[in-house]
């Protein structure tokens, strides 16, 4: 064993020794160094590869440790800085002292200076070739040891130079970026200096938004949009008040400015391009130097606006952006997806919640007291058949700094749209079967328009709200509901809420709450609805009947987006549309007549109600909740008791009230059953065409229908203020407050429809919006005001009709009427809260005291967002400007005073001469009386401004402010045409001087402007405004019932119908306002008196009365006439007797300074009206006006002018019809509604004579022409309205004097004219204007404006022309000239304000933008002028066939075919037409009438007056009995004596005028209607 073990061991040793030997042998060999080095290298490489992972891990661990360590020493700080530099790929090193750390790259370096203790001293950044500059932001970050932010800055600096090319090229690119930043900074400073805007204004409206300069690594930031919800604190839900120190970078929507490399080469500036420090236009556009080789370089790079998060944009937006920049937005074709899907993703991505939401495009919103479910119909087909597609945009390329403002505006528009749609996208989860869950469908209609459909809060029907995002701060809204559906709220209310909260759920909640409020206020609604349904059960017009659709694209969103255009689309277009709508409906719906009548006719509604609950009844059925089902009270009894009602039910074409009031967006939209999509698609063109085609057929088709419609129109005007709304937009009534300025729309704009040829429903709303803006107060203020007013007004049971369009808008004409008429409403927030409805809504939406509305939740009053938006300059130009200019001066005060004044003047003052006078004076002083002109507003506002202003003016009150001005303008206008002067042709000019031109002779005219101003200051103008307001009825052309009409329709019930709304037409500064305020007020007073005198027109009478009371002479006269015709009937009567004396006085007054042309006119008007009436022919023509020969306009002008007119009229049958025509018209007006129409023409002549007569004596040619025109228009309208009213009540049947036929004819003609008035693109609008009472008035105003404006310049010419015209046609010529001369500044806005008798908040029916006579005088102004003049003229010729010259203005009227210049006797009409035609001789024609025709007219009129006075007395007595209850209404009218008078006249006039303007101006096809009206009137005679 032992031996064996040893053996094994030895073997092992031997093996080991052999192994060692081998090793020794191997390593003893000489190995070459190359092999050794190679071997070592291989080993090292392997080692690196192996340790790479571990190294990274070690580095990350080290960095984590460093972050966890507190930096308290110098070494710790330098270590941390070096670590951060390494993370960003930058080098770092320390200085010799160890206290400076440098972080470096090729293009820049950062120097961090520390003290020995490691505390930070300073941080400097040095770009290539520049000296180091201290960076406070970096200092702050390092002092706070915020190393993450410091690291982000370093990343930003690195990315800034992440450009192609070498360092030299990168340096040039940096220089280009620097120059761009300097230019943008200058632009921001320019905007701030020009507007002194706060942070929110800068964000929403600034040319470059809220600019934050580049700092450290943060690029220059442009904050371009912030929504109301962004301004709420997430934690406390309290509003964030922005100031310069608390605008965080992350707030709202931002874009950073940078330069990046591109594949293409672009020429970029490397030096600043802005020269000087002042912008070159009102959009703050700086002056840029041109791009040259000296200041720019070709670089493979371009400027970019980059967004932190890609923004969903529509396909159309992409195209707009590329058109703006000229550079493709995407290098490769983007992928498109449904826009709503992208918006949904964008909204959900804001929430950090990682849990995906399985929404299926269905979202829930839990609101106070309500739970909503929203379905976003992303695949809904657009009109082109495709769904709304979009894509995501992360950056926008541009080359020039001047492109930035355009790009930002486009982005703001898109983001505003996205914000509204995104407001429905919430992560809230509710059960499908939750009790009370409300379902809503959001459906795209275009890239900027969408609809929200939901169940009617009261009825079992579908309601649709169409929202059109016109720009980032203006959203126009239109509510579509069934004709029989209860009123929900006004379009303006919705728009206000939307703009305030930019949230669909909050808006829907506010709408529902508003509807509930209305229902609570109108408990009898269901009963009424049932009755109406029973009535028209057999022949209910199809919901989609054209009539409804008639809404004419106007109300729908289609139409110009500009506030101004919007307005035209609104009031004028609307009015036109309304008439058209009615006809359309007639044609389309043969059997809905009863229903349509009930639903459309506020008068009918009020008649049905019997209770005199005109207010509630007033709204069109679609419009008013009350009216929704016309009140049923005792329909049979009512029908029996009211011939007018019988007539309405009998022949009334199946006109939707909504159609009639279609002007009012809400009304129209409510009434229109057509889907928003349809309406939108059809657009205004469709409507126009429809109207045009329909109207003409309508005439032949419904002769009786035409008559009936006319009657209805005037009735509508009387009975439903909503009609006034019609002209504006549905919300116009509210608009006075709401109306920013439409504005401001521009948009609307808002109820200040321009005579724009194209009807634009959607614009209307916008207009209103602008109107709102112009209203002046912030949305918040307005909202709070509204909330307050709403609390007051709700009692009126008006949703938000209190002051303005809401009434009509709300589709509750009656409702709105009551608010309008309610003195409470007027007085309540006369000055600033005309928007009762909006107030309520806002209260709801904004969390008014009474409401738990989320609005409060979302934005408190403190939130400036919406107000800013509303007031934003981007309001389409009709924002604050309108409101501020017009109303800021005395308007508000006047308005305030006017609330009660309006009531008093409208109601009481008119009723009692002394009383009216006292009230007027007390409230408005003499000027108060001068309502008709008041609306002109002393300020020299641009047409848009004026309109806006009118709109802005809260109502009559507001107007009163303007009234003073407008009174002057009115006077001027009266020189131009008292009634129309409200429209204030001169005012249109917006030239103060011209405007100053008064109805009185040139000398007087000139003086008058001061008076007008005085009136403004005195505050009388407010009254006048009120008086003018009656002029507004024209606004409600659709509801041809004008105040007079309204009063009338109310009168028919024999109950005090809701006070007749006063209609004030405000005209731009340029507007001609003649006479000093006191003088003017006197004038108005006279006008009022004459109005009152015409008992036919209650409103007129009231107007008259107030007018009388205001004017000194008129005062006594008025006290007599006023008290006698206090109810309008008595007023009329006394006017008859005292009218003669008044007319005499008037004439005298004309000469007397104290009397002042206006007073004279007023007196003249009254006298004229009486006398006119005596002029059997015109009277006969206007049969209904027997008692009210000259409707307010007539009255206004006729008193003094009447004498003159009466004589001149007689002598001038062949003479220039201007005077004659006016006289005849005046008398005609007095004679009957037809007379009213002719009256308007006559009125014009009468005005010229009357107003000129007193005033006209001084300024017969030009001022007369204008005043005659105005007066004529007003008178005619008023007369028609009033007459119809009266007839409706006293002679509901067809008065012996053809009153009804006349009225009907007038209405039909108006409608036809309206429909017809589509000859030209602009014509339709004008036509529409004409059609709308407002339109008519406005056209008058525009014409007068021209006259007035021109008058200033042309006034002297006019005066000269007067002499000339006396013999020749100088009146017409003058008018023309005025219009021509006014061409330049003629454009203006005429505002028609309708006030309620009860003194309810005034409402602005329509805002008419008057175009320059030269440019649009033919189309816009002319039609307007033509409208008023034509109106009067046809009536005149119809009225007084012997005044064939007058007939020219009626050239359309069969009796007076001549529309030639020789027909200058048309005076108003002819002038309107001619001036539109720019035919000097025509103008001259008008003036001549006043001069030589005056005496004959006076005689003639006196004779006729005697006859008519008797009739009037009789009528008056009847009316008194019937109207005593309505006394208030007349008084309301009386609030604006002249206005009332005129407005009534205007109403009729407007209606007729609408037709006539068509004739007068080729644009207006209304002429045909005029002919028909004239025929009817003549035949009726």
From Swiss-Prot:
Post-translational modification (record): Phosphorylated by MAPK1 or MAPK3 during G2/M phase which may enhance protein stability and promote entry into the nucleolus. Phosphorylation increases its interaction with PSIP1.
Q: Where is the composition biased (Pro residues)?
A: 622-632
Tissue expression? Ubiquitously expressed.
Q: At which positions is motif Integrase domain-binding motif (IBM)?
A: 875-902
List, as start-end ranges, the regions of compositional bias called Basic residues.
1496-1505
Q: Where is this region: Disordered?
A: 609-705, 792-820, 874-893, 948-1566
* Summary of the function given for this chain in its UniProt record: Component of the Mediator complex, a coactivator involved in the regulated transcription of nearly all RNA polymerase II-dependent genes. Mediator functions as a bridge to convey information from gene-specific regulatory proteins to the basal RNA polymerase II transcription machinery. Mediator is recruited to promoters by direct interactions with regulatory proteins and serves as a scaffold for the assembly of a functional preinitiation complex with RNA polymerase II and the general transcription factors.
Comp. bias regions, Basic and acidic residues: 696-705, 963-974, 1352-1364, 1506-1522
- Tell me the keywords, alphabetical order: Acetylation, Activator, DNA-binding, Nucleus, Phosphoprotein, Repeat, Transcription, Transcription regulation
Give the residue ranges for region: Interaction with the Mediator complex.
Answer: 108-212, 215-390
Q: Which residues carry this modification: N6-acetyllysine?
A: 1177, 1529
Tell me what happens on changing residue 889 to D: Increased interaction with PSIP1
Identify the species of origin: Homo sapiens (Human)
| Pfam families in the record | Med1
Which effect does the record note for changing residue 886 to D?
Answer: Increased interaction with PSIP1
Positions of the region Interaction with the Mediator complex and THRA? 1-670
The record describes its quaternary structure and partners as:
Component of the Mediator complex, which is composed of MED1, MED4, MED6, MED7, MED8, MED9, MED10, MED11, MED12, MED13, MED13L, MED14, MED15, MED16, MED17, MED18, MED19, MED20, MED21, MED22, MED23, MED24, MED25, MED26, MED27, MED29, MED30, MED31, CCNC, CDK8 and CDC2L6/CDK11. The MED12, MED13, CCNC and CDK8 subunits form a distinct module termed the CDK8 module. Mediator containing the CDK8 module is less active than Mediator lacking this module in supporting transcriptional activation.
- Using the record's annotations, give every residue carrying the modification Phosphoserine: 588, 664, 795, 887, 953, 1156, 1207, 1223, 1302, 1347, 1403, 1433, 1463, 1465, 1479, 1481-1482
This chain belongs to the protein called: Mediator of RNA polymerase II transcription subunit 1
Q: Where is this region: Interaction with ESR1?
A: 16-590, 656-1066
> What's the encoding gene here?
MED1
């Amino acid at each position: 064993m032992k031996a064996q073990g040893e053996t094994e061991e030895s073997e092992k040793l031997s093996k080991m020794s052999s192994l060692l030997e081998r090793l020794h042998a191997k390593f003893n060999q000489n190995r070459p160094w190359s092999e050794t080095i190679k071997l070592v290298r291989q080993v090292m490489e392997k080692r690196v590869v192996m340790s790479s992972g571990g190294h990274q891990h070690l580095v990350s661990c080290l960095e984590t440790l460093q972050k966890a360590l507190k930096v308290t020493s110098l070494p710790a700080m330098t270590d941390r800085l070096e670590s951060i530099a390494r993370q960003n790929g930058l080098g770092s090193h320390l200085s010799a002292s160890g206290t400076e750390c440098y972080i470096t790259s090729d293009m820049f370096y950062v120097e961090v200076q520390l003290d020995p203790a490691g505390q930070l001293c300073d941080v400097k950044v040095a770009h290539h070739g520049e000296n180091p500059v201290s960076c406070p932001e970096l200092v702050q970050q390092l002092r706070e040891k915020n190393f993450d932010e410091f690291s982000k800055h370093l990343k930003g600096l690195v990315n800034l130079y992440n450009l192609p090319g070498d360092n030299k090229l990168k340096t040039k690119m940096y220089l280009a970026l620097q120059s761009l930043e300097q230019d943008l900074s200058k632009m921001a400073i320019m905007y701030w200096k020009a507007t002194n805007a706060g942070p929110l204004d800068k964000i929403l409206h600034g040319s470059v938004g809220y600019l934050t300069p580049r700092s450290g690594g943060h690029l220059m930031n442009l904050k371009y949009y912030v929504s109301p919800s962004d301004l709420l604190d997430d934690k406390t839900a309290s509003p964030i008040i922005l100031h310069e120190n608390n605008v965080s970078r992350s707030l709202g929507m931002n874009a950073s400015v940078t330069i990046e490399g591109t594949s293409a080469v672009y020429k970029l500036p490397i030096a600043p391009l802005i020269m000087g420090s002042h912008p070159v236009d009102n959009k703050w556009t700086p002056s840029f130097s041109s791009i040259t080789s000296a200041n720019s370089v070709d670089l493979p790079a371009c400027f970019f606006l980059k967004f932190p998060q890609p923004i969903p944009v529509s396909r159309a937006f992409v195209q707009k952006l590329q058109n703006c920049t000229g550079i493709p937005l995407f290098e490769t074709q983007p992928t498109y997806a449904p826009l709503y899907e992208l918006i949904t993703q964008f909204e959900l991505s804001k929430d950090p919640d990682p849990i995906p939401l399985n929404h299926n495009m269905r979202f829930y919103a839990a609101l106070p007291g309500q739970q909503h479910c929203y379905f976003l119909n992303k695949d809904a087909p657009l009109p082109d058949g495709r769904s709304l597609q979009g894509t995501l945009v992360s950056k926008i390329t541009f080359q020039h700094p001047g492109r930035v403002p355009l790009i930002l505006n486009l982005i703001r528009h898109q983001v505003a749209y996205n914000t509204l749609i995104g407001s429905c996208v919430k992560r809230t989860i509710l059960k499908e079967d939750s009790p009370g869950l409300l379902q809503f469908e959001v459906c795209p209609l275009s890239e900027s328009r969408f609809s929200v459909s939901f169940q009617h809060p009261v009825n079992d029907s579908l309601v649709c709200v169409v929202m059109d995002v016109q720009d980032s701060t203006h959203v126009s809204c239109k509510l579509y509901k069934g004709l029989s559906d209860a009123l929900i709220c006004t379009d303006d209310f919705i728009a206000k809420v939307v703009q305030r909260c930019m949230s669909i759920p909050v808006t829907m909640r506010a709408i529902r709450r508003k509807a509930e409020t209305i229902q609570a206020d109108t408990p009898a609604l269901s009963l009424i609805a049932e009755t109406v349904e029973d009535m028209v059960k057999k022949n209910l017009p199809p919901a989609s009947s054209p009539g409804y659709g008639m809404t004419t694209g106007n109300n729908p969103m289609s139409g110009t987006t500009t506030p101004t255009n919007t307005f035209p689309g609104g009031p004028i277009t609307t009015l036109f549309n309304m008439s058209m709508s009615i006809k359309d409906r007639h044609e389309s719906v043969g059997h809905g007549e009863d229903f349509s009548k009930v639903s459309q006719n506020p008068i009918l509604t009020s008649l049905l109600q019997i209770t005199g609950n005109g207010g509630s009844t007033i709204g069109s059925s679609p419009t008013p909740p009350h009216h929704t089902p016309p009140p049923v009270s005792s329909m049979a009894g009512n029908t029996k008791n009211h011939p007018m009602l019988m007539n309405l039910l009998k022949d009334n074409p199946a006109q939707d009230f909504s159609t009639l009031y279609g002007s009012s967006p809400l009304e129209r939209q409510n009434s229109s059953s057509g889907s928003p999509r349809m309406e939108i698609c059809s657009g205004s063109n469709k409507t126009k065409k429809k109207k045009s085609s329909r109207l003409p057929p309508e005439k032949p088709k419904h002769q009786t229908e035409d008559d009936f419609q006319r009657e209805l129109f005037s009735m509508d005007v009387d009975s439903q203020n909503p009609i006034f709304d019609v002209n504006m937009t549905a919300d116009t009534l509210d608009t006075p407050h709401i109306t920013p300025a439409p504005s401001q729309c521009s948009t609307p704009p808002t109820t200040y429809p321009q005579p724009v040829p194209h009807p634009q429903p959607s614009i209307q709303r916008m207009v209103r919006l602008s109107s709102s803006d112009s209203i002046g107060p912030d949305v918040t203020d307005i909202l709070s005001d509204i909330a307050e007013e709403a609390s007051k007004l709700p009692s009126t049971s008006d949703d938000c009709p209190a002051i303005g369009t809401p009434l009509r808008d709300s589709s509750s004409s009656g409702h709105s009427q009551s608010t309008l008429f309610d003195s409470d409403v007027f007085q309540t927030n006369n000055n600033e809260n005309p928007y009762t409805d909006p107030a309520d809504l806002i209260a709801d939406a904004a969390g008014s005291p009474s409401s738990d509305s989320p609005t409060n939740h979302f934005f408190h009053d403190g939130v400036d967002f919406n107000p800013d938006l509303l007031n934003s300059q981007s309001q389409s130009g009709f924002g604050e400007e309108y409101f501020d200019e017009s109303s800021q001066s005395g308007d508000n005060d006047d308005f305030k005073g006017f609330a009660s004044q309006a009531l008093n003047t409208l109601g009481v003052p008119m009723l009692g001469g002394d009383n009216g006078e006292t009230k007027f004076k007390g409230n408005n002083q003499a000027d108060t009386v001068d309502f008709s002109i008041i609306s002109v507003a002393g300020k020299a506002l641009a047409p848009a401004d004026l309109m806006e202003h009118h709109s802005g003016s809260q109502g009559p009150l507001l107007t009163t402010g303007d009234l003073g001005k407008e009174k002057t303008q009115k006077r001027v206008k009266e020189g131009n045409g008292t009634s129309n002067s409200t429209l204030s042709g001169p005012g249109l000019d917006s030239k103060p001087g011209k405007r100053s031109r008064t109805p009185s002779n040139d000398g007087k005219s000139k003086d008058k402007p001061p008076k007008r101003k005085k009136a403004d200051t005195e505050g009388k103008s407010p009254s006048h405004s009120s008086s003018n307001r009656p002029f507004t009825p024209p606004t409600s052309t659709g509801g041809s019932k004008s105040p007079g009409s309204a009063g009338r329709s109310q009168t028919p019930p024999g109950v005090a119908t809701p006070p007749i709304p006063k209609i004030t037409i405000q005209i731009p500064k340029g507007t001609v306002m003649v006479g000093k305020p006191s003088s003017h007020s006197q004038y108005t007073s006279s006008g009022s008196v004459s109005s009152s005198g015409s008992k036919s027109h209650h409103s007129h009478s009231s107007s008259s009365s107030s007018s009388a009371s205001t004017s000194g002479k008129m005062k006594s006269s008025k006290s007599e006439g006023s008290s006698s015709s206090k109810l309008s009937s008595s007023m009329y009567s006394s006017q008859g007797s005292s009218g003669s004396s008044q007319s005499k006085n008037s004439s005298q007054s004309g000469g007397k300074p104290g009397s002042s042309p206006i007073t004279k006119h007023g007196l003249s008007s009254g006298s004229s009206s009486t006398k006119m009436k005596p002029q059997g022919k015109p009277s006969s023509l206007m049969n209904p006006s027997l008692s009210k020969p000259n409707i307010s306009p007539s009255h206004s002008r006729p008193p003094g002018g009447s004498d003159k007119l009466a004589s001149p009229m007689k002598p001038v049958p062949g003479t220039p019809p201007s005077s004659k025509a006016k006289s005849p018209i005046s008398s005609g007006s007095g004679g009957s509604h037809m007379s009213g129409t002719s009256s308007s023409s006559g009125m014009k002549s009468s005005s010229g004579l009357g107003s000129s007569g007193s005033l006209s004596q001084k300024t017969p040619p030009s001022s007369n022409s204008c005043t005659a025109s105005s007066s004529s228009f007003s008178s005619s309208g008023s007369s028609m309205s009033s007459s119809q009213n009266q007839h409706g009540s006293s002679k509901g049947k067809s008065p012996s004097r053809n009153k009804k036929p006349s009225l009907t004819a007038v209405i039909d003609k108006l409608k036809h004219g309206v429909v017809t008035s589509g000859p030209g693109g602009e014509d339709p609008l004008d036509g529409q204007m004409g059609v709308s009472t407002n339109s008519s008035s406005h056209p008058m105003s525009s014409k007068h404006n021209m006259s007035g404006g021109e008058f200033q310049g042309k006034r002297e010419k006019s005066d000269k022309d007067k002499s000339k015209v006396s013999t020749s046609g100088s009146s017409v010529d003058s008018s023309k000239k005025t219009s021509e001369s006014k061409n330049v500044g003629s454009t203006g806005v005429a505002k028609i304000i309708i006030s309620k008798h009860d003194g309810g908040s005034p409402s602005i029916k329509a805002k008419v933008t008057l175009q320059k006579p030269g440019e649009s005088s033919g189309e816009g102004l002319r039609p307007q002028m033509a409208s008023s003049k034509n109106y009067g003229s046809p009536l005149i010729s119809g009225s007084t066939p012997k005044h064939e010259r007058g007939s020219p203005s009626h050239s359309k009227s069969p009796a007076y075919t001549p529309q030639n210049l020789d027909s200058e006797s048309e005076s108003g009409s002819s002038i309107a037409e001619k001036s539109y035609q720019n035919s000097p001789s025509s103008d001259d024609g008008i003036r001549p009438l006043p001069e030589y025709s005056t005496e004959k007219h006076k005689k003639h009129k006196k004779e006729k007056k005697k006859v008519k006075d008797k009739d009037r007395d009789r009528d008056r007595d009847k009316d008194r009995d019937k109207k005593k209850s309505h006394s208030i209404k007349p008084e309301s009218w009386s609030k604006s004596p002249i206005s009332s008078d005129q407005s009534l006249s205007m109403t009729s006039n407007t209606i007729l005028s609408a037709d006539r303007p068509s004739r007068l101006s080729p644009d207006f096809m209304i002429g045909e209607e005029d002919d028909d009206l004239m025929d009817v009137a003549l035949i009726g005679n």
